[in-house]
Amino acid sequence: KENEPENWKRISLFLTPNQYVAYHLTGEIAIDRTSAGNLGGIFDYERNDWSDEMLELLGIPRSMLPQRIIDPTDILGRLTAEAAAELRLMPGTPVCAGCIDCLASTLSGVYTAGHTVAVLATSLNWGLLHDQRQKNPQYITMPYLTKEHSLRYTYGGISTAGALTKWFAGNLAGGTGVQGYEEREKKLLFRELEQAAAEIPAGSEGLLMLPYFMGERTPIWDSK
């Protein structure tokens, strides 16, 4: 809006990646509660609706957001004939709304209030599943993915976690980068790094790295 005003004028609707795919599959526009809760603090999870106060503060028209907010397990729509033909599936196949990736992974064993969970991938989310109101606005709180609407997930997020293995391989393990590597070469390189890391004692002999390679999210909130 501030840095690319011309592109801002061209925007008609904000959709998260999973809902964008669902739109092309069904022709229906909606958003699940977890995705809505992950959109920069503009979702009021007490009311299960967009926050008019935050939208006004940020200058975002409500019309730019999906008006239908549903649970992840709800049927968003049904497969169109065109999408069904391309995917070789039956037209009318139900398509669920889905949810944010990190919450989907918690279903492997974390679905009770009081449990903590670390989700490690490209980035890292480490948080608590609870049924309390958010007490610290520096952290992110979003609705949990079950139909039990009292459950919430509050977490701190590190932007670069698993992504650092690629940076390390490209800059310190040969200095040639990994972009030009064949897939087989990449696997061999990372396997060698994994074997070498296994020989390092716990604590890395006092070496400490602060993973602020792309700014930081909660609770630091510093883009630099």
Each model region followed by its residue ranges:
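Active-site core segments that coordinate phosphate-bearing ligands/cofactors
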Residues: 1-30, 41-57, 75-77, 81-224
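A glycine-/small-polar-enriched, mobile loop at the entrance of the PLP active site in fold-type I
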Residues: 37-43, 63-73, 154
